[in-house]
C-alpha cells in the first residue's frame, strides 16, 4: 500500500494483511486491498480499480471468528487469498483480544 492511512490518535494497528477480501454486509463484495486490525476496528482500504475505504467498529458489536471469517456485528469479512502479511497471526490477534 502506497497511501497514508489516517487513524485516530488513540488507535493502534495490531496486524495487517493484504489480499483478496470478501465482504458480506447484506451484499457480497470482493476487493483486493489491505485489511487492518486495530484496537478499535477492522479497516479495509482498496485502491485497485475503485477507491474504497470501509470501517467495522468493535464498540458495541459482537465479534467472532467462524471458519476463518471475521464477524463484527452483522458484517462478515473473509480473506480469500493473502498476498502479504501473516494471516494466522491476524486471525489469532482478532480472536484473542477483547477491545
Question: Residue spans of the language-model regions?
Answer:
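Phosphoinositide-dependent membrane-docking surfaces
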Residues: 41-44, 52-69
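Residue-level signal for tight coil/turn positions that link beta-strands
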Residues: 32, 39-40, 67, 74
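Short coil/turn linker and secondary-structure boundary residues
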Residues: 60, 82-85
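Intrinsic-disorder-associated interaction segments
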Residues: 6, 80-83
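Short hydrophobic/aromatic-rich beta-strand segments that constitute the beta-sheet cores
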Residues: 42-46, 72, 79
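Anionic N-terminal interaction surfaces
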Residues: 1-35, 75, 88-99
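Short, surface-exposed beta-strand-loop junctions and turns on beta-sheet-rich folds
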Residues: 48-53, 76-78, 85
Amino acid at each position: 500500500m502506497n497511501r497514508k492511512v489516517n487513524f485516530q490518535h488513540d488507535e493502534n494497528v495490531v496486524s495487517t494483511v493484504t489480499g483478496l477480501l470478501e465482504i458480506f454486509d447484506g451484499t457480497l463484495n470482493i476487493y483486493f486491498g489491505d485489511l487492518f486490525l486495530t484496537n478499535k476496528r477492522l479497516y479495509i482500504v482498496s485502491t485497485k480499480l475503485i477507491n474504497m475505504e470501509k470501517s467495522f467498529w468493535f464498540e458495541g458489536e459482537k465479534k467472532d471468528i467462524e471458519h476463518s471469517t471475521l464477524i463484527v456485528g452483522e458484517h462478515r469479512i473473509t480473506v480469500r487469498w493473502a498476498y502479504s502479511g501473516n494471516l494466522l497471526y491476524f486471525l489469532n490477534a482478532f480472536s484473542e483480544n477483547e477491545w
